[in-house]
Structure formats: C-alpha cells, structure tokens
C-alpha cells in the first residue's frame, strides 16, 4: 500500500488539518491485507482513531466493488456527503459512488398521486403536507425524504406517500419509469462503492428484496461500521413481524382502490373498515405504550385471545373479498398479495410453541408490533458469509468486553477472523476524570429523582450546563428533567420534545444547556469542544430483566450450559456504557468529566469488568474534585 497515512502522504497533502496517527495507519494496513487475502477482519478502534479514513482509503485503492454499511442513517449520510468525497478527492479516485437507503426513505410518486386524489378524506394538516410534497416532488432530484425541509420529519403524511416492500406495485406501477427507488437502485448497480445501512443490507440478504439482491453478489468487499449493532439488527431480519401500521396501510389501500377504480364493489370498503377497527381495538387491549412484553404470556389472556381472533378473521375477510376482484386494479392486486403475506405471518405468530424463538410484542401510543426472533443468529449469519466470498470487515469503537472480542464474534458466528484492538490515541489521563458519586439515593424509591437532581445540580451549574444527562429509562429521564427545570435557570432540553437533529442544534447554539436524554443519544452523537464537557449517566445500562428478547437469549445461554449474567447481560451493558462514555472526549483538545451515578461500579465484583473496558481516566468519588477539574480552562 502506498503510505497514504504518512506525514507527507496523499491524505496529509490534500486534507487541511490532517494529522497522521499510528493506530489509524495500523488499521489501514490490516484492512488492506484483509482485502488482498479475502479474509474476515474485526477491528475495535477507540474514539479518535480516525477509523472511517482507515477503511475508506484501502477500499478505494483496491479498485474492487465495495459495499459500506453503517448502523445509522446519520452516519450513512455523513459518509456519503462528507467523508467519501474528501478521501476520493485526496486519492484522485475516479470510480462511481452511490447512496442507497431502504425504500421507505424515498417519496413514492404513485402513492402521492393517490393521496392527492383522495384529498377530501384527509385531515387538514395531512392534506396541507401532501400539497407541499407535491410541489417538492417537482424540485427533488433523488426523492430522499431526509432532504425535504418543508414538511416535519414526524408528519403523519410520510407513511402515506412512501412505499414499503409490501405495498410497492413494482413494474406494474404507472410511475415506474420516474420511480426514485428504481433510480437509486440503478445508480447503485452501476457504482463501484455503495453506501447502505445495516437494516437495508440485512433486509436484502434475508428477504432478497427485488432489485437490490442483484447488487450484493458482485461485491468483493463488505465493510460494516458501527458493527456492534449488527447482532441485534440481524435478529430482527432473521425473524418475522407484523405491525398495526402494516394492517392500517393495507386497509387504506383497499379503500383507495374502491374509491378510484372499483366503485361497484362496496364490500371492499366494509372489509377495510373492519380491518382498521380490529387493529385499533387490538392496540387498545395492550394497555400502556412504550412496553415490550412476552407474546406467549399475552396470548394466554382470554380477552386478548378474542381480540386476536377478531384480527385474524377480518384479515381473512379482506383476503376473500379482494380475491373476487383480482385483475381489475393494480393497487388491489398488490393489496391482495400483502393480505396473503400477512395471513401467513399471523399464522406463524400464533404458533407460539416453536422452540428456538423469542415471541414478543411492543406498543407505542398508536401502534403495535407482534414479532418472533431467533435466539441466536450465529449459524444464519455464518451461512450468509459463506454464500458471499470476499472480505468481510467489521469495525466499531465498542466491540470488546475487557479487551476480548469473543462476545461480538460468537453472536455473529464469525470464525478465523483476523482481529485488532486499537486504543484511542487521546490522553485520557490529562483530558478526562471519572467520578462515581458517594451517598447516592436508593433507585426506584419515591423521590429518588429529586434527591439525585439535588446532588447533581452543583456540578452542572459549576460547569455552566454544557452537559448530557443520559438516562437508562424514559421515566427517569422525564422525572429528572422536571426536577432540573424546577430548580435551575439553565436551559433544560428534553429528548422527544423535538427531533434529535433540532435538539442537538439547540444544545450547541445555547452554549450552556443541559440535555436530558435516553437511548438514542447514547451513540452516534458527535459534539466537539467546550460545548459538551460533562456527561452524567444515571445508572449502569443493564437491559430490563423483563425484556422478552433478553430473557430468551439468557434462557438459550442457560440451555447451552453458560452463565447468562456473564455471557449475555454483562457484556451487553458494558458495550452500551462504552457508547455513552464515548460522547465525552471527541477530540485531542477536549476535556471533561464523566459522572456515573451507580455504586455497583465500585461495590460489586463485576464493576471491575466495566472499569477495565472504559478509557483509562483517573477516578474519584469526590464531586468537589470533579468541579475543580472542570474549572481548569481547556488548552483551546
């Protein structure tokens, strides 16, 4: 490999401010060798290694077909619009590059047209968004909905004007030649480097979604960034699920077919109404939102059983009625195919005694999902890798537990892979301090949020905000935010009150804010400099013991003679904590304090595993020392 990473290499010459880093060069060498030998490679690269450039440069130099997959759409967009162009330009790369997302990320012109025709039946706000989207549809080049600023990202119009694998009419669609998904796929087929995300990669490999399936067999190199998310995402795709959103979409499409093309078939409207009603009734039976529970236990309840049977019957009715009008409307024909698919899925979900699977359900305020997930995806993922010879490269800042990658590789069935553990080049002994508070209030006791907020207030105020408070539950997040707002004058931002992107923008522009958040801010958030110099974590992030997926994995581990705590719960929590901690120091000049409000870190034997997996920062139990550390001005 020409040494692109040397002080006088291509990257240093072409990229302003590029500083050579030894761990980055080591990773680039390992990636180059893995590509040349066509063998798997697993790399944990600590924050600040510069892992993106370390895999991009060798991948572009290899002149092979490359798929790069990310855990989040945010990183996918950043790679495609920022990192890839920068490295391509530096290396004078002349190949074609494409971005490909799942089809629900693109505007569907046919569904937009159908909604505009059904306009009078839509609520006013949705109708006004549909009108805005019609005007946007004439301006957009790629139809990527993340680039539309005129309609809010949580607008209820989006599911109506985007397609899913289930409701797409495919080549029968009157808008097929202008279809944004088809254009994006064609571009990806012709490209040398394609940027996708894990959801799309796995959906394609498992479901063989038409079109994209032809793209992957040709790839010589598969690179997974944020690879720590792969095992959980893979388990979703190797299982099956059915959601109320899918059923309500089906009912809507049957209604549109009746109102536009099949006005003589009133039965269609009746069966669509009954399906929508039974889906909503079933959601009401499930109770509180935000809960993930055991489907086997749920279906033992006679009341739920009755609602489930009713759902099954109305789906059956839609299938029978749609069958009578086959061949008269492309929209209804597609709806019939979905009804067939959903009947099969519902049947699988009813057979709750299949061993080797976890059966679970989840509900939000308006919707529910019923799902079955395999307990282990190792064999299936191993099979997948065997079918696709080439280099499989997995990287993330958080793959190891106590300097061991086995937890990650065993979950994906990765064998005989080269592995590399690269520590962060940051000087944590100078840049950071870890504080585990003394005299913490008893968790889950009434008033614990009030006491904790009172303990934390002095350090947050001494730091003039500039703080992330990361919580392990929504309830704690809301309670703490309420306490902070009642007792502090600093701006307190709360996750969920606006979109993630806007919250981050508000946090950065305020310059003295406290952001109280939960899971989605634990990873993939990059705030550099003095804007963020304090990260507080309310407790060690063990997954709730009631979570059916966790329970099932623990049971599977027990049956194999393992220790569920040591092999499942502890490693999962360590990886999550490492992600949260990684929010603090993002640059060589950053300084900050990490506060963990959980005595178990120092009182329980397993605390040592957590500490051994964290960056080597000095530790204290004295909050006054943490306040003094924050008072020292940074070297910026």
Swiss-Prot record:
PROSITE patterns per record: HELICASE_ATP_BIND_2
EC numbers on record: 5.6.2.3
Keywords in alphabetical order: ATP-binding, DNA damage, DNA repair, DNA-binding, Helicase, Hydrolase, Iron, Iron-sulfur, Isomerase, Metal-binding, Nucleotide-binding, SOS response
GO molecular function: 5'-3' DNA helicase activity; ATP binding; ATP hydrolysis activity; DNA binding; DNA helicase activity; helicase activity; iron-sulfur cluster binding; metal ion binding
GO biological process, one term: SOS response
Motif DEAH box, chain ranges: 225-228
Activation and inhibition: Non-hydrolyzable ATP analogs ATP-gamma-S and adenylyl-imidodiphosphate (AMP-PNP) inhibit helicase activity.
Domain Helicase ATP-binding intervals: 10-272
Free-text remark on how the cofactor is bound: Binds 1 [4Fe-4S] cluster.
Record SMART domains: DEXDc, HELICc2
Effect after changing residue 629 to A: Partially complements the AZT sensitivity of the knockout mutant
Result of changing residue 51 to A: Cannot complement the AZT sensitivity of the knockout mutant, decreased colony size in presence of AZT, not toxic upon overexpression. Loss of ATPase and 5'-3' helicase activity
One Pfam match: DEAD_2
Record's catalysed reaction(s): Couples ATP hydrolysis with the unwinding of duplex DNA at the replication fork by translocating in the 5'-3' direction. This creates two antiparallel DNA single strands (ssDNA). The leading ssDNA polymer is the template for DNA polymerase III holoenzyme which synthesizes a continuous strand; ATP + H2O = ADP + phosphate + H(+)
Signal peptide: none
Induction: Transcription is induced by AZT and repressed by LexA; has an immediate rise after AZT treatment and a slower response that peaks in the late log phase of growth. The late response is not entirely under control of lexA.
InterPro entries attached to this UniProt entry: ATP-dep_Helicase_C, DEAD/DEAH_box_helicase_dom, DinG/Rad3-like, Helic_SF1/SF2_ATP-bd_DinG/Rad3, Helicase_ATP-bd, P-loop_NTPase, RAD3-like_helicase_DEAD
Role noted for this protein: DNA-dependent ATPase and 5'-3' DNA helicase. Has single-stranded (ss)DNA-dependent ATPase activity and 5'-3' helicase activity on forked DNA; both activities were measure in a YoaA:HolC (chi) complex. Requires a 20-35 nucleotide (nt) 5'-ssDNA tail; dsDNA with a 20 nt gap is also unwound. Unwinds damaged 3' nascent ends (such as those terminated by 3' azidothymidine (AZT), 3' dideoxy-C or an abasic site on the translocating strand), to promote repair and AZT excision. Without HolC the protein has much lower activity which could be due to YoaA instability or helicase stimulation by HolC.
Complex formation: Interacts with the DNA polymerase III subunit Chi (holC), probably as a 1:1 complex.
Similarity annotation: Belongs to the helicase family. DinG subfamily.
Protein's UniProt name: ATP-dependent DNA helicase YoaA
Species in which this protein is naturally found: Escherichia coli (strain K12)
Name of the gene encoding the protein in the UniProt record: yoaA
């Amino acid at each position: 490999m020409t040494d692109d990473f040397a002080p006088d290499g291509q990257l240093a010459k072409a990229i302003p401010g590029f500083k050579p880093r030894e761990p980055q060069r080591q990773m680039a060498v390992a990636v180059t060798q893995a590509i040349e030998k066509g063998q798997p490679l697993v790399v944990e690269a600590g924050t600040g290694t510069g892992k993106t450039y370390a895999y991009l440069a060798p991948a572009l130099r290899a002149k092979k077909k490359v798929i790069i997959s990310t855990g989040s759409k945010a990183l996918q967009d950043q790679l495609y619009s920022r990192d890839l162009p920068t490295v391509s330009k530096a290396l004078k790369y002349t190949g074609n590059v494409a971005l490909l997302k799942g089809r629900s990320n693109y505007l569907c012109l046919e569904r937009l047209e159908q909604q505009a025709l059904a306009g009078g039946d839509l609520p006013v706000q949705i109708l006004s968004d549909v009108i805005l989207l019609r005007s946007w549809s004439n301006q957009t080049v790629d139809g990527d909905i993340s680039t539309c600023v005129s309609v809010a990202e949580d607008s209820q119009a989006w599911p109506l004007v985007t397609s899913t694998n289930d409701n797409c009419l495919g080549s029968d669609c009157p808008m097929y030649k202008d279809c944004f998904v088809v254009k994006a796929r064609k571009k990806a087929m012709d490209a040398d480097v394609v940027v996708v995300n894990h959801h799309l990669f796995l959906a394609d490999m498992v479901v063989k979604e038409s079109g994209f399936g032809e793209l992957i067999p040709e790839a010589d190199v598969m690179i997974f960034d944020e690879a720590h998310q792969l095992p959980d995402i893979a388990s979703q795709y190797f299982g099956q699920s059915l959601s109320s959103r899918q059923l309500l979409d089906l009912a809507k499409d049957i209604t549109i077919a009746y109102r536009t093309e099949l006005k003589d078939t009133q039965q269609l409207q009746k069966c669509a109404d009954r399906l929508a009603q039974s889906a909503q009734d079933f959601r009401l039976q499930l109770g509180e939102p935000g809960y993930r529970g055991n489907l086997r236990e749920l279906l033992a309840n006679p009341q739920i059983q009755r609602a489930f049977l009713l759902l099954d019957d109305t789906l059956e009715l839609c299938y029978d009625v749609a069958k009578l009008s086959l061949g008269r409307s492309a929209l209804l024909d597609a709806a019939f195919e979905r009804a067939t698919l959903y009947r099969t899925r519902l049947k699988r979900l009813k057979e709750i005694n299949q061993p080797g699977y976890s059966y679970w359900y989840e509900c939000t305020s308006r919707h529910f999902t019923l799902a079955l997930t395999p307990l282990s995806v190792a064999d299936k993922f191993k099979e997948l890798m065997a079918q696709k010879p080439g280099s499989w490269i997995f990287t993330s800042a958080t793959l190891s537990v106590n300097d061991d990658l086995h937890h990650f590789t065993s979950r994906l069935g990765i064998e005989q892979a080269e592995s590399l553990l690269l520590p962060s080049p940051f000087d944590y002994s100078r840049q950071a301090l870890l504080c585990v508070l003394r005299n913490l209030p008893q968790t889950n006791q009434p008033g614990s949020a009030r006491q904790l907020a009172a303990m934390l207030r002095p350090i947050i105020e001494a730091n003039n905000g500039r703080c992330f408070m990361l919580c392990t539950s929504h309830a704690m997040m809301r309670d703490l935010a309420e306490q902070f707002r009642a007792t502090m004058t600093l701006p307190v931002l709360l996750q969920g009150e606006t979109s993630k992107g806007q919250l981050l923008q508000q946090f950065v522009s305020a310059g003295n804010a406290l952001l109280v958040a939960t899971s989605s801010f634990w990873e993939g958030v990059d705030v550099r400099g003095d804007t963020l110099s304090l990260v507080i974590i309310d407790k060690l992030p063990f997954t709730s013991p009631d979570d059916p997926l966790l329970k099932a994995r623990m049971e599977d581990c027990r049956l194999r003679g393992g220790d569920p705590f040591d092999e499942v719960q502890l490693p999962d929590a360590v990886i999550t904590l490492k992600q949260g901690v990684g929010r603090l120091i993002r640059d060589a000049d950053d300084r900050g304090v990490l506060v963990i409000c959980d005595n178990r870190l120092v009182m329980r034997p397993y605390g040592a595993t957590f500490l051994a997996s964290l960056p080597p920062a000095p530790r204290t139990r004295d909050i006054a020392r943490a306040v003094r550390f924050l008072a020292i001005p940074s070297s910026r």
